[in-house]
């Protein structure tokens, strides 16, 4: 791949905060119009015979630098901006933080044709880090980003100081469990129906155990604004392609092969499971059991440590940022 690095800091404006009950804003296909909490840079490269660009934040320490770097990988229904409070906590303690948007998501390119795989996304991320001068880092992944982080640690173990998984999806193999297959075309049709109301309903039910706080509305508006904007069709198509990737590329069977210090942070009220809506009721009732899945994953990963948040759901860093940040910093402090 041909690589070059273009640093283009965006002018920051007040962060979007529309209520999820209001008509969502209309953002561009690369989330134009939604301001990130720190300057955004662009990593430009060629992949699969096309030019692409990855957006990312590269935030320097505000506290005394400790010489360590943390990479934050977002989930499928999230963006790098969702790590806002985590970034602030990390840089205050002297860490350099990089938070990219993966290809197909948020402010990054959304190709019409791309062979999405976790190996490819890991390679893209690794190349970005090399260009940024990062040779070794702690990798933190949330939701789909947790699946990616696990693949990354398997693919580049020598470059990972720690692996920290925050309610990762992929702690079970849904297809092997019996969840029916869904075509990319069907995923796309489902994605085209996505709006602010459906996003909020899903997150409230699956992520937050039926509860809701006004501060979550901002993230609903961010996601809904992508679908409502002029690039909504391209956004839905990329979401369909990546849903197919997530469903068909399990990582749980490879957990025993991980050879890096690993910590799992598991909100116990999480019930996320890809394709649960297709599963027979009896099967669906067994999927996304994060209290059990977290324990099973910790047992499968050599030397893994489990941090359970009994009263939290899928996004501890959003739901209780101070508690999560304290736990994350404690885990990072155990690095050899």
List where the protein language model places each region.
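N-terminal signal peptide c-region/cleavage motif recognized by signal peptidases
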Residues: 13-17
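An N-terminal hydrophobic leader/cap segment in hydrolases
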Residues: 18-45, 54
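Conserved serine/cysteine hydrolase catalytic core
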Residues: 43, 228-294
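Active-site loop/oxyanion-hole signature of alpha/beta-hydrolase fold enzymes
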Residues: 44-50, 57-63, 92, 102-140, ...
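Conserved HGGG/HGGXW glycine-rich cap/lid loop of the alpha/beta-hydrolase fold
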Residues: 48, 52, 57-107, 327
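Flexible "cap/lid" loop of the alpha/beta hydrolase fold
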Residues: 150, 154, 163-194
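Conserved alpha/beta-hydrolase catalytic His-Asp/Glu region
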Residues: 194-256
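Catalytic active-site module of serine/aspartate enzymes centered on a nucleophile-bearing elbow/loop
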Residues: 291-336
């Amino acid at each position: 791949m041909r690589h070059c690095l273009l640093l283009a800091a965006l002018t920051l404006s007040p962060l979007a905060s529309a209520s999820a009950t209001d008509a969502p804003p209309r953002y561009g296909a690369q989330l134009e119009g939604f301001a990130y909490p720190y300057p955004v840079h662009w990593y430009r490269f060629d992949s699969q015979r096309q030019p692409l660009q990855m957006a990312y934040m590269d935030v320097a320490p505000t506290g005394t630098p400790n010489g360590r770097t943390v990479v934050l990988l977002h989930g499928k229904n999230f963006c790098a901006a969702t790590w806002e409070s985590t970034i602030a906590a990390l840089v205050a303690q002297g860490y350099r933080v990089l938070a990219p948007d993966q290809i197909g998501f948020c402010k990054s390119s959304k190709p019409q044709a791309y062979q999405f795989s976790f190996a490819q996304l890991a390679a893209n991320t690794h190349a970005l880090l090399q260009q940024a001068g990062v040779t070794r880092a702690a990798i933190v992944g949330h939701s789909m980003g947790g699946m990616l982080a696990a693949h990354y640690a398997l693919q580049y173990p020598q470059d990972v100081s720690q692996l920290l998984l925050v309610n990762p999806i992929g702690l079970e193999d849904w297809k092997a469990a019996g969840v029916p297959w869904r075509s990319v075309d069907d995923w796309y049709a489902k994605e085209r129906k996505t709006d602010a109301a459906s996003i909020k309903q899903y997150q409230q039910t699956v992520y937050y155990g039926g509860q809701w706080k006004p501060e979550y509305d901002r993230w609903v508006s961010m996601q809904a604004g992508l679908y409502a904007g002029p690039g909504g069709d391209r956004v839905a198509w990329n979401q369909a392609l990546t849903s197919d990737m997530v469903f068909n590329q399990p990582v749980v069977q490879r957990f025993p092969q991980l050879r890096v210090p690993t910590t799992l942070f598991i909100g116990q009220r999480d019930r996320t499971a890809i394709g649960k809506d297709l599963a027979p009721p009896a099967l669906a009732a067994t999927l996304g059991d994060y209290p059990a899945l977290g324990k099973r994953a910790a047992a499968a990963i050599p030397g893994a440590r489990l941090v359970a948040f009994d009263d939290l759901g899928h996004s501890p860093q959003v739901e209780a940022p101070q508690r999560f940040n304290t736990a994350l910093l404690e885990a990072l402090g155990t690095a050899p």
